[in-house]
Amino acid sequence: MRSYSRRSEPRPQPLRCALLVALVAAAPALAQASSVTQWNAIASTAPVAPFFGGPPQQARVNAMVQIAVHDALNSIQPRYESYDILPGAAADANPDAAVAAATYSVLHGLIDPKPDSPAKTAALDAINNAYAAALADIPDGNGEVHGIAAGAAAANAILARRANDGSATPNLPYAAPVAIGVYQPTPVMNTDPQAYIVPANEGWGLMQPFVMRSPSQFRFAPGKLFDIKGQAYTRDYNEVKAKGDALVRGAMPDSEESDIARFWPGGGANWNRVLREILAAPANNPQLDLDLDLWQQARLFALANMAESDAAIAVFDTKYTYRFWRPITAIRWQDDGNPATAPDANWWSFMATPPYPDYLCGLTNASGAHTEVLRRYFRTDDIAWGFTFNAPSVPLPAPLLPLPAKSITRSFVSLDEATAEAVDARVFGGMHFREGCTKGVTQGEQAGRFVFQHALRPLR
């Protein structure tokens, strides 16, 4: 396991002026994006992605989209193993039409015709408008028609394969004793003190993986922090209590620790963007061959998103196997039997605590999955990236006013540096104990490694 050190102070941040300027300036380069990266952006960002649910639901959708894109291109010119067996496409099939039709067809196939809602309308408008624009740029004729057919065939194959994968029942009735160390439903800030969020996604740990052999293949052993009176728990408890306190962070809204907590959204929401940014700005990584064609890009995105989705299944399997409590419950507990932990009944996490158990962390799990695929694809950890994230407003305990939305820029010179910061983010956000975060990275890496080794391999 990699070592993610505990930091009592924010890590020194060299200015790296030239790198930072280059990374931030890279965003406009997305105008040069390919059909693969353009459609990935549509599927993995608002308003489309949030319509499908939280991070694990979005990961499943992204995996299905990218598999269809990969298989559609592979049916035109076979270069890698296909995920689903498809008939060969016509030789003149237009690749860009295939990519557009594959994405469009998967997304439409996953959206129920009813009921209507503003979110659904916004998602469909984004998908339909992008599809119309994509086809308008492709010459009319047999090539376009055959490309659309290839994309639709790949989409239909993955939709059929995942029709009964268990995703329809993400939530199960939650029952657990009210006891020390056991996850309790997450309270809601600034509402009725008895208001709680119903625990979510227990059923996700039972879902059919894309590549892993079973949901429990990479289940982790119990953590050291499960010993509530032990040194590991005491250390993690006191760290998150001090660093992740909403009042502490709210009093230092522009500190690096507060920025780190806000920069990293739920699950792997930013990692598709990271990959697009890396491909769009080759000058930031001159040591890498980033001149990937559509087939190579499609394979890379498919591997990364299958890894993230399988890692999410593994993490929810682990979470609900152990049902370890969150800091928001642990710190408010009147007496946990550990004389070295002092309770605080009024403590709130800086970032909203999600409604599922602590161990392991979903963000770091997704980060480990994506970075392991990137590490193996490019055969190096030294991959630089960075961008500006528009962090939303953060509510604080009453009577304090919420922190306003803020643009936060972060940059990294390696994948390991990024995953280490993802670990810190969940501690500084008050959402997780550190051990669950560090092991989340490792579990994600295990899933990413397995996917890379067993799926979409080059044809010999």
Where do the PLM segments sit?
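Basic/polar N-terminal segments that are highly enriched at the extreme N-terminus
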Residues: 1-7, 30-34, 460
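Bacterial N-terminal signal peptides
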Residues: 16-28
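Selective for proline/serine-rich intrinsically disordered segments
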Residues: 8-12, 26, 137, 393
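Bacterial N-terminal signal peptides that target proteins for export
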Residues: 2-18
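Acidic/polar surface patches and capping/hinge elements
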Residues: 32-460
